[in-house]
Curated annotation (Swiss-Prot):
Compartments in which it is found: Nucleus
Function: Protein phosphatase that catalyzes the dephosphorylation of the C-terminal domain of RNA polymerase II. Plays a role in RNA processing and termination.
SUPFAM superfamilies recorded: Phosphotyrosine protein phosphatases I
Catalytic activity: O-phospho-L-seryl-[protein] + H2O = L-seryl-[protein] + phosphate; O-phospho-L-threonyl-[protein] + H2O = L-threonyl-[protein] + phosphate
Taxonomic classification: Eukaryota, Metazoa, Chordata, Craniata, Vertebrata
One MF term in the entry's GO annotations: RNA polymerase II CTD heptapeptide repeat phosphatase activity
The protein, known as: RNA polymerase II subunit A C-terminal domain phosphatase SSU72 like protein 1
Length: 194
């Protein structure tokens, strides 16, 4: 068993749907978790597919909620965005960018390959301080409500297995292979150092 609580981060593009659904589920299971986005702005579905609603990362979930409520309550209720923002507000005030976080994690889950690339690049560009390893694992999760929930449960299952592991470093690869077979998903995995 790990000697201390597993420190987990979940990262998607905007820190709104996939990472926050995982954050919600992992937190309910008692895990130490934070969530992040990697883009320069938060982008939410807008009135047309090519016209997203764009917010700065400093905008709180409550401010986004109120803005969308004012713009088109029916549309943003129907597409689930108001529900998502309400859930997010109960977890933390607003979205956070991974690149601005200086905390250390044992495992970082990313929800798409481009986010994985950004996280790995960011970690590799930082000056190494402690040489503590951090496992970065990518699992492709479509940015839909249903897929975010399914992905969050799979991330939770992996975290619970790691939390119970006698040696995370030795058991992680085997665990990921088992999860690939079970879930029919493939994972990218690398180790970076703080």
């Amino acid at each position: 068993m790990l000697s201390s609580t597993l420190r987990v981060a979940v990262v998607c593009v905007s820190n709104v749907n996939r990472s926050m659904e995982a954050h919600s589920i992992l937190r309910r299971k008692g895990l130490s978790v934070r969530s992040f986005g990697t883009e320069s702005h938060v982008r939410l579905p807008g009135p047309r597919p090519n016209r997203p609603v764009v917010y700065d990362f400093a905008t709180t979930y409550k401010e986004m909620y109120n803005d969308l409520l004012r713009k088109d309550r029916e549309r943003y209720t129907r597409n689930g965005i108001l529900h998502i923002l309400g859930r997010n507000e109960r977890i933390k005030p607003g979205p956070e960018r991974f690149q601005e976080c200086t905390d250390f994690f044992d495992v970082i889950f990313t929800c798409e390959e481009s986010v994985y690339d950004t996280v790995v690049e960011d970690l590799c560009s930082r000056e190494q301080q402690t040489f503590q390893p951090v496992h970065v694992i990518n699992m492709e999760i479509q940015d839909t409500l249903e897929d975010a929930t399914l992905g969050a449960f799979l991330i939770c299952e992996i975290c619970q297995c790691l939390q119970q592991s006698d040696d995370m470093e030795d058991n992680l690869e085997e665990l990921l292979l088992q999860m690939e077979e079970k879930a029919g998903k493939s994972f990218l995995h690398t180790v970076c150092f703080y």
